[in-house]
Amino acid sequence: MSEKKNKKEKLADEIEQEELNILDETEETVEEEAAADTLTEEQAKILELENKLDEVENRYLRMQADFENVKKRHIADRDASQKYRSQSLAQDLLPALDSFEKALATTSDQEEVKQILKGMEMVYNQILVAFEKEGIEVIPAVGEQFDPNFHQAVMQDSDENAGSNEITAELQKGYKLKDRVIRPSMVKVNQ
């Protein structure tokens, strides 16, 4: 009987040992799952932080690009302002220049008038030299092909000696500042 009892005890010990092993394995599995959940939460947090970092980096790069564009635009505006600084002064002086040209077109036999005209011509030439220094030029007209960017056609002509669309007369001089037209030439164009 003692042998049976020993076998029963042994069997009970084995069962108990097996139950303990199963319990240990279950605890390990639960711990692993909990650790996996914790790891997954940590990974999710890391992923979220990485996404936020990427978003902030992208915003930073966009802001940096915007700043560079504003800086370039400011430089271009400043350069254009410097380049065309004398435009308003030239526009204000053009009527006076036109008056000089009309006065110089008159002729007289009187010596006093000739001296006055000579003085006016000197002033006129000085204004033209000052214009040239600032990059202001007369727009060529007579004999040139009509260009609506530089010329304003106010009359048509029928001259057989001139080509089609050729300017035959200039009624008012046009001027440009570097590459910008200040005032187009008023012209007569051949048909």
UniProtKB/Swiss-Prot annotation:
InterPro entries: GrpE (IPR000740), GrpE_coiled_coil (IPR013805), GrpE_head (IPR009012)
A GO-annotated cellular component: cytoplasm
Domain of life: Bacteria
Alphabetically ordered keywords of this record: Chaperone, Cytoplasm, Stress response
GO MF annotation terms: adenyl-nucleotide exchange factor activity; protein homodimerization activity; protein-folding chaperone binding; unfolded protein binding
Subcellular location per the Swiss-Prot or TrEMBL entry: Cytoplasm
GO biological process, one term: protein folding
Self-association and partners: Homodimer.
Family to which this protein belongs: Belongs to the GrpE family.
PANTHER family attached to this UniProt entry: GRPE PROTEIN, GRPE PROTEIN HOMOLOG, MITOCHONDRIAL
Reported function: Participates actively in the response to hyperosmotic and heat shock by preventing the aggregation of stress-denatured proteins, in association with DnaK and GrpE. It is the nucleotide exchange factor for DnaK and may function as a thermosensor. Unfolded proteins bind initially to DnaJ; upon interaction with the DnaJ-bound protein, DnaK hydrolyzes its bound ATP, resulting in the formation of a stable complex. GrpE releases ADP from DnaK; ATP binding to DnaK triggers the release of the substrate protein, thus completing the reaction cycle.
The protein's name in its UniProt record: Protein GrpE
Taxonomic source organism: Listeria monocytogenes serotype 4a (strain HCC23)
Gene behind this protein: grpE
